[in-house]
């Protein structure tokens, strides 16, 4: 993760920092983030990084958003200390973050998904592998024995065909 205000603001706006989801403000969804980024770009503020340090009334005035939305954005952007602790734990475990504006972000995701591409990715390992042709398999972790055999057969075929297998939530 590059240490820029733009990246930091993106991570603050999108991250769920507590396990029990009991936060003062709910992080932005992907769709909300894209809309909000466009609002910011169309304003005099220009970029998400320039929002850091703004108070609620400045957010309202500069972006033309309702007080409730300004409060939510303000609350999300002011979790810097908490986020620093969370990021430190991630980095210790070899987990990193890349955001859509960074050079390392997989271009294929943007090409294929457009504004449905996740603005932020958590990853471990070599992110450059995501530039290769591949197949993502997620959620295959809690299956019966027959399902596991089926998935193993599928995985074997994927690998023999020369595709990179990207997993998430699988065993």
Identify what each model region corresponds to.
Residues 1-149, 153:
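Short, positively charged patches
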Residues 156-159, 163:
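Glycine-rich phosphate-binding loops that contact phosphosugars or nucleotide phosphates
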Residues 166-169:
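Structural motif
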């Amino acid at each position: 993760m590059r240490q820029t205000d733009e990246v930091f603001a993106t991570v603050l706006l999108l991250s769920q920092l507590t396990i029990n989801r009991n936060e003062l403000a709910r992080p932005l969804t992907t769709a909300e983030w894209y809309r909000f980024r466009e609002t910011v770009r169309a304003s005099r503020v220009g970029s998400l990084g320039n929002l850091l340090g703004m108070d609620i009334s400045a957010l309202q005035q500069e972006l033309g958003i309702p007080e409730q939305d300004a409060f939510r954005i303000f609350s999300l952007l002011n979790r810097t200390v908490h986020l620093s602790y969370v990021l430190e734990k991630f980095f210790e475990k070899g987990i990193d973050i890349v955001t859509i504006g960074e050079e390392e972000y997989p271009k294929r995701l943007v090409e294929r998904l457009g504004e449905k591409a996740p603005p932020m990715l958590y990853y471990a390992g070599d992110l450059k592998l995501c530039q290769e042709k591949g197949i993502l398999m997620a959620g295959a972790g809690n299956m019966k024995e027959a399902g596991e055999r089926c998935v193993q057969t599928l995985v074997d075929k994927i690998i023999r065909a020369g595709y990179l297998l990207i997993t998430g939530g699988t065993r």
